[in-house]
Amino acid sequence: MRMSIAIPTYEVKGRGVEFLNDLFRTIEIQTFKDFEVVVSDHSKDDKLVDVVDEFQYKFDITYVKNKNDLGNGPANTNNAIRNCSGDIIKVMFQDDFFYDDEALQKIHDSFNDEHDWLVCGSNHTQDDGNNFYWDLYPRWNDSIIKGVNSISSPSVMAAKKKVFDQIKFDESLVMMMDCEIYYHIKKKFGEPIYLHDVLVSNRVHSEQISSRYNASSNSTSDLDREVQYCISKHLE
């Protein structure tokens, strides 16, 4: 089965080139080679094109300049997925990267006829990959729709194309975009494969959405509104 890696991108306050380059370098060394990369770019400038040009002869890359819904992360992620053609679609956020050079191979080999999506283990770095901490092994909990995230960011998920053909990231959400889609997919397609290998590193930095929200004086009320919306959408 051919794989697609869907990457939504933007400027990240001047660090977008650095982050995408780091991610591409971990893609280049993957042992599994039957994949494409799709970049959906919300940047107002064209600096990320230089990174794409640098790697375009190393693996198959499709670059899409997305001028719609600027600043809406779920919409940009959906656009990246929409342009994917693989049998399995692996979501990767621009500021995260693969921790294991066999990550794609392990994800590919784990898929079967009984399961339609997968979540893998992850760790975290605050110093751009010099040190790693907090290995998180995904598990389900019934409060995930209330924002109790025991899985991690969307960078740990992969799904068969038919899943994303039917279910999209909810474009009205920010902080709950991951928990909501996990709940939605499980409700329709059943349990994921829980791959308890650490395959992805989540980069912790000041410009990531969770950091910006935590620094906002309205963060609690904004999150509460999103949680109530998700409960109304799925439980009422």
Predicted feature descriptions by range:
Residues 67-84:
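Glycine-rich, basic loop-to-helix element that forms the pyrophosphate-binding segment
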